[in-house]
């Protein structure tokens, strides 16, 4: 692959993860902000639809193929919330810490065995803005919500997401360890295999 793709995100954590995961491939990932693309509101009802909105917007502005991600945290005890509202769970201008505080408050009376959750990620790839057959790849990462924060790495809800297999929070893992088991890592591995067959 000798390609340049625009990544339809301004999230520095996601950009770093994607660039790290693709470093062994001859692919240049250009963050959309570097090409003058602004973020658009995530107005759809599902992760997949939101990712497609973002990818189409980036394609239309840049003329480049686009990769877009939509992801979030789904907590069983909260009927799948925060879900598509993960980034703005505590309000439209919420910080990651605001979101974590709200989540922990809502789970304060929930026993540890009922705090199961998963990170979900969908990655979509559009060859051009009118691509009728976008590549859509999904990944999940199963875990438990901790009662307090652990670790200083990562971003978002990572400090309160416990991986029972790794016996660590997502924020205690190195980026290499995280990419090996994360929702985004799983989705990107699928996307890479599909791209290798189609480009």
Where are these regions (language model features)?
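Anionic-ligand binding patches
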Residues: 2-6, 12-199
């Amino acid at each position: 692959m000798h390609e340049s793709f625009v990544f339809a995100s301004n999230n520095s954590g996601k950009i770093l993860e994607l660039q790290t995961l693709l470093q062994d491939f001859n692919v240049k990932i250009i963050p959309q902000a570097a090409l003058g693309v602004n973020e658009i509101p995530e107005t759809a009802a599902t992760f997949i639809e939101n990712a497609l909105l973002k990818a189409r917007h980036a394609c239309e502005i840049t003329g480049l193929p686009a990769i877009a991600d939509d992801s979030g945290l789904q907590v069983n005890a909260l009927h799948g919330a925060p879900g598509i509202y993960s980034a703005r769970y505590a309000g439209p201008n919420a910080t990651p810490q605001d979101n974590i505080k709200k989540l922990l408050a809502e789970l304060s009376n929930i026993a540890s065995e009922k705090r199961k959750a998963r990170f979900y990620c969908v990655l979509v790839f559009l060859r051009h803005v009118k691509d009728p057959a976008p590549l859509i790849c999904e990944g999940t990462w199963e875990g438990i919500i901790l009662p307090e924060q652990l670790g200083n790495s990562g971003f978002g809800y990572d400090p309160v997401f416990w991986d029972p297999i790794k016996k660590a929070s997502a924020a205690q893992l190195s980026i290499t360890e995280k990419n090996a088991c994360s929702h985004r890592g799983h989705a990107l591995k699928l996307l890479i295999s599909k791209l290798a067959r189609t480009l």
